[in-house]
Regions:
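Canonical Rossmann dinucleotide-binding motif of NAD(H)/NADP(H)-dependent dehydrogenases/reductases
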Residues: 4-37
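Conserved glycine-rich Rossmann-like NAD(P)H-binding loop of the short-chain dehydrogenase/reductase
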Residues: 31-51
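Catalytic Tyr-X3-Lys loop
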Residues: 91, 111-130
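The beta1-alpha1 cofactor-binding region of Rossmann-like NAD(H)/NADP(H)-dependent oxidoreductases
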Residues: 47, 67-80, 115
Length: 130
C-alpha cells in the first residue's frame, strides 16, 4: 500500500488497545485512515485505547478512542451510530476483539470448559460485529 492510500477512509478495529488490534490500527493510521479504536481499557497507561489512538495520530492517521463493551448490545449500537453520525459510512471493519475468560481456562479438553466460555467468545468474537 502507498502512503495515504486510505486517507478519507473510516475504519473500526475492535479490541485495539493492545496486541494485534493495536498493530492493525496503527497500520491503518500509517496509510491515513480515520480509525475508531475500541476496547474497555480507557485512560492513561500503555495498554489503553487512548494510547493506541495517540499512536495512530502519530503515524499520520486520525485515532478516535471509543470505550465499548462488545458484550453490551446498546454500547455496540452507540459505537456504530457515532461512526455514522460522524462520517455517514464505515469503509473498513476489523473484528479483532477477544475476551479472556476469568479465570483463564487454557489447555485441557475443550468439551470440559464451561459453556459460558464458549458463549462469551461467540458473543464478542462473532455476534458483536453483526
Amino acid at each position: 500500500m502507498k502512503e495515504n492510500e486510505l486517507k478519507g477512509k473510516v475504519a473500526v478495529v475492535t479490541g485495539s488497545s493492545r496486541g494485534i488490534g493495536r498493530g492493525i490500527a496503527v497500520g491503518l493510521g500509517e496509510k491515513g485512515a480515520t480509525v475508531y479504536i475500541t476496547g474497555r481499557s480507557k485512560g492513561n497507561g500503555p495498554l489503553t485505547i487512548d494510547e493506541t489512538a495517540k499512536m495512530v495520530n502519530e503515524a499520520g492517521g486520525v485515532g478516535v478512542p471509543v470505550s465499548v463493551d462488545l458484550g453490551d448490545d446498546e454500547q455496540i449500537m452507540r459505537l456504530y451510530q457515532q461512526i455514522e453520525s460522524d462520517h455517514g459510512r464505515l469503509d473498513i471493519h476489523v473484528n479483532n476483539a477477544f475476551k479472556i475468560p476469568n479465570p483463564p481456562v487454557w489447555g485441557g479438553k475443550f468439551w470440559e470448559h464451561p459453556i459460558q466460555v464458549w458463549d462469551d467468545q461467540v458473543g464478542i468474537g462473532l455476534r458483536a460485529a453483526y
